[in-house]
């Protein structure tokens, strides 16, 4: 569809979310009084292309009915080419509570999961930051910090097949 659901509290869901740039698989962080949104566009793997892009952009609100609702121009933070061993999709964001550093994981089961550092003030990739391969054979990763430990969660299996889906969290 053209949009989706949005929630201010993670429990109450509202219809009418705007999907900027027709992107997919977004992740959102609140940084100060703004929201940093990361999403991806892709050519699709599985016989298609591995050409993908992860972008970030800012908004003051996630409520599409607010007069303050306006995304900034998207900034590319990761890309993948047709013959690459990673598909730049499925961004996951983490603001490290111990250091204030901002991280973005991305990738799909067609190759590696990669990690890059972003500037928490701009949402841009830190200059000179090389992508680090951190996992393989999973997708839709997210990063968590709990009680002194860092976790990389991902999904493994097949999706989008109703009751025949085998997706599980690893």
Predicted regions and their residues:
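Carbohydrate-active catalytic/glycan-binding domains of CAZyme proteins
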Residues: 1-170
């Amino acid at each position: 569809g053209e949009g989706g659901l949005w929630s201010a509290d993670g429990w109450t869901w509202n219809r009418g979310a705007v999907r900027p740039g027709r992107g997919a698989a977004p992740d959102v962080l609140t940084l100060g009084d703004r929201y940093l949104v990361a999403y991806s566009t892709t050519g699709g793997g599985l016989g298609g292309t591995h050409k993908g892009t992860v972008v970030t952009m800012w908004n003051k609100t996630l409520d599409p009915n607010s007069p303050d609702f306006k995304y900034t121009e998207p900034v590319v933070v990761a890309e993948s080419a047709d013959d690459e061993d990673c598909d730049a999709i499925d961004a996951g964001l983490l603001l490290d509570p111990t250091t204030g550093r901002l991280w973005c994981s991305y990738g799909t089961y067609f190759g590696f999961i990669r990690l890059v550092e972003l500037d928490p003030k701009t949402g841009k990739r830190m200059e000179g930051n090389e992508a680090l391969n951190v996992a393989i054979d999973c997708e839709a990763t997210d990063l968590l910090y709990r009680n002194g430990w860092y976790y990389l969660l991902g999904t493994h299996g097949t999706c989008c097949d109703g009751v025949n889906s085998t997706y599980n969290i690893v």
